[in-house]
Amino acid sequence: MFQLRNFEAIKIGLASPEKIREWSRGEVKKPETINYRTLKPERDGLFCERIFGPTKDWECHCGKYKRVRYKGVVCDRCGVEVTRSKVRRERMGHIELAAPVAHIWYVKGIPSRMGLLLDMSPRALEKVLYFVSYVVIDPGDTPLTKKQLLSEKEYREYLDKYGNKFRAGMGAEAIKELLQEIDLEKLSKELKAEIRESTGQKRVRAIRRLEVVQAFIDSGNRPEWMILDVIPVIPPDLRPMVQLDGGRFATSDLNDLYRRVINRNNRLKKLLDLGAPDIIVRNEKRMLQEAVDALIDNGRRGRPVTGPGNRPLKSLSDMLKGKQGRFRQNLLGKRVDYSGRSVIVVGPELKVYQCGLPKEMALELFKPFVMKKLVDEGLAQHIKSAKRMVEKIKPEVWDVLEEVIKEHPVLLNRAPTLHRLGIQAFEPVLVEGRAIKLHPLVCTAYNADFDGDQMAVHVPLSMEAQAEARFLMLAANNILKPQDGKPVMTPTQDMVLGCYYLTADEEGVQGEGKYFSSPEEAITAYQLGYIHIHAKIKVKMTKEIDGVKKSKIIETTVGKIIFNEAIPQDLGYVDRTNPETAFDLEINDLVDKSKLGKILDRVYRLHGPTKTAETLDKIKELGFRYSTKAAITVSVSDMVIPKEKEKLLKEADEMVSKIESQFRRGLISEEERYESIIRTWNMTTEKVTEALMTSLDKFNPIFMMAHSGARGSKNQIRQLAGMRGLMADPSGRIIELPIRSNFREGLNVLEFFISTHGARKGLADTALRTADSGYLTRRLVDVSQDVIVREEDCGTDEGIYVEEIREGNEIIERLADRIIGRVAAEDVVDNEGKIIVRRNELINEEEAEKIEKAGITKVKIRSLLTCKSRHGVCRMCYGRDLATGELVNIGEAVGIIAAQAIGEPGTQLTMRTFHTGGVAGSDITQGLPRVEELFEARKPKGLAVISEISGVVRINESKKRREVIVTDEENSISKTYLIPYGSRLKVHDGQVIQAGDELTEGSVNPHDLLKIKGIFAVQTYLLQEVQKVYRLQGVEINDKHIEVIIRQMMRKVKVEDPGDTSMLPGELIDMFKFEEENKKAVEKGLKPATGRRALLGITKAALATDSFLSAASFQETTRVLTDAAIKGKVDPLLGLKENVIIGKLIPAGTGLSRYRNISVVKKVKDQQDAQDKEKEEAEVKASN
């Protein structure tokens, strides 16, 4: 096995026939596989031991040489080398073809590479290859032209007329001859001249041809290598044949395909030897061509070759393609040792960083560690007896296991792993039973519940892996979400309910108004049953201030005292410097879910992760204890139906009948009638809900659950005890008959039927959404996987201006939220000229608030959109790592984090296109399809008309059509835009607009925006639009994640005029490479190229990456590989995927080369000490 770290890049190219023979260990001459009697491989067959190596370790075919001592001997009887049977996985063979055959990838691909090189149409090429027409190879002095096609009849006529003055041929032989004659350099010059002179279709064709010609010149591939004279045979253990129970054999499809090739090849050889008539030989050659096509890519041309049961056989191309192909199934998704899975149950007694591991599972996972320890401690003589002890499960094994697991973290993963919090590390605690115990607080991150979910356990083995698990992945260190930097470990459900109940206060309960000398006394009184937990009491608080004991009486409840014992008392909710408030409890009001989140956020910011983990455990403990003591439960009597409901419904009925009569009298249109009725019922539902919420008691269990944020919502309470309200029909249109009943009263048949529409649509929607969201995440990961923080500072002066995002008058995202954790690109100065933040400094929460208070509306920040790092991004442009709150570390895989942050909430987004009042054009795409539309840079549905010039608007309305005329007075140009029927105008007469402004409502086509307004405008537009979709669903995502993706979408430049560089017109090239090439050209005094930034959708961008391995493992595998082979592409192995594929450490985190090449140098101090010691000893000796 070669050393994995030894190579920097990997190259792909076409193999010459000599190369294929060089790889091969021998020619496969017979189609036989194994002898049915002896079950040994046939000689010269597809499994031949002489070619591929022995089937048994250290044993030749005939059995003359057995045992390791004959290692390397080649048997003189059967010719098999004595070696390991493993070589059957790596030794290749070959088949010498009797006639050349074209490689289907280069014939059929789009565009057909062979066709472009020869300047033949793919149809003509196919006719020649499959022996339908002749092609003229050398016209001699006849009126024929080179590469002209002749039918059988025409060929005969010309042959009679001119005899052998010209040469024509058919099949791959003819094409091979034509390819050999091509002079690439000359052709390249001709094409360049043609590109300069011609226009239109002709020029486009020349550019495409030049691209292929240039690829062959640069890569050193020869065109005739696209025709195969020799076919490689892959090692037999990669296309195995195994015996099934019934004595039958199961074999890989490839063996069938190879067998057909060999059979036809042998038959062709025989026919050629016999000198058979031309027509028979030709037919055999065509069949050989088809057999090789099926082997390489079955089904690409004509009907696929099928096996038993009409199943198409899997060819070499199919082995690579798709989810089950080599790339995605085996290279990117390996199964690993030292892992197990089991059902999870809740473990409320655990600490945040612990998990319960079933004993038998732990024993199996840590088996080698246990065995070594047994030997080390002398409990077993040697490893073998230790193994026996473990397998017999002797009692002393358990004690050793306890010791082994101490300080050895394990990883827990729950599928689907939507973001990096789906795998976290825990310290295992051995538990009885067979279920893994999970801490309740990490459930949110895993999205786990205990209705039968399963989780997988993995053991990190090496010291480095253990250290990374402990420091980076330990659950206690992953308290913040990488998406938005908010805590992910907030208490939920019972815990929230317990804290809510604990901190509530109630009027007129036992013990109200009593005084206590200390908090402890109050708690004792509560425990002895003298006061109620909710009673308002007075408590004397004592504190030492500057060494002097001071005290003050405050009003609170026992519950609040207990709650405050669990949290630090210096969170800044109370001003401790003010003697009036210095003694107050930190939290002296009702605590609900959002308040808990804020408290934890503060604890984290002030005290760091360790303290937060402790606080979390205390809150968990309290929450569970008091929700149990409160004994909150739900019963029908808790659903109190408001008395006003009947009256409100009656009023609504009257209103509706009024609207109906107006409609019948023709005062209002059908549309207005429908809208008014819907509005009436919506208002009524709202009123019923308000009446319900006011009538519910503050300690009503259902109200408490919803109000505390533990479970349920106002909406659900409305359906339980108010009225269900309006429902939508299958098309999404709202049905004007509302459901008047609630669930307590029960629905009647019609109401039940109406509500089934919505329920069914909801389920179908969820199923579709999960798949779509997963696919979106996959594309995002693929486009951004090589974005890694690679340097400290890229040194750019550029940045972007950010301001708050508004939708109409409503602020969607505040300025402060957008600049927290970013680096300022220039000094931020308030009105008095005082600097709030200097250039290149990180903006934190306080500074962001200051900036907003100072009335500054836009701030210039460093951004990923302007980062100048050639590979990856730099620390300054990225800013704060949201999961830690510090400046991002070098080596952080920010691309993948960004993709996960955008993809993970994808399932929560809605699928539907909202239908509002049936106006055409106002149907806007929202939710997941809208995000996809933006990231794929598609032309959106409901397109807005945008102005290409700045100027004054004039609106012309005639009966037939509406026009908007924009006039630019200064440059005296005007443009007229036809407004489609049904669109709403966004501008009015006489309004002054800028180029790129929308004239009608709807979504803008990002490509138009790029042309008119430029790069920055389109980036801002995409960013804001994606944010709008997520914000409407209440999902917070930090801008920088979306910026990473947009950066990747806009990395390429489309070359317009290549100047004197080696680039081709219309080529997509990385912008950094483009600048580099131009710099070289200018230095040599040549004309640089011109180009414009291109906007690619994420699928296109992922396929246009520099790494062919990454692109091939994403989509369109054969197309990517065909292209890469012809261009002789080199994969520099910079991203994560390509390194996973070839099995190297990924270049992120500690795998970055700058960290990997560190070696420890012994400290100088130690050397100094040693020298001093030697001196002392010498002195002592001397004195003696």
Swiss-Prot record:
Binds 1 Mg(2+) ion per subunit. It catalyses: RNA(n) + a ribonucleoside 5'-triphosphate = RNA(n+1) + diphosphate. One of its GO terms (molecular function) is zinc ion binding. Zn(2+) 2 binds at C794, C867, C874, C877. Gene3D superfamilies: 1.10.132.30, 1.10.150.390, 1.10.1790.20, 1.10.40.90, 2.40.40.20, 2.40.50.100, RNA polymerase II, clamp domain, RNA polymerase Rpb1, domain 3. Mg(2+) binds at D449, D451, D453. This is DNA-directed RNA polymerase subunit beta'. It comes from Thermoanaerobacter sp. (strain X514).
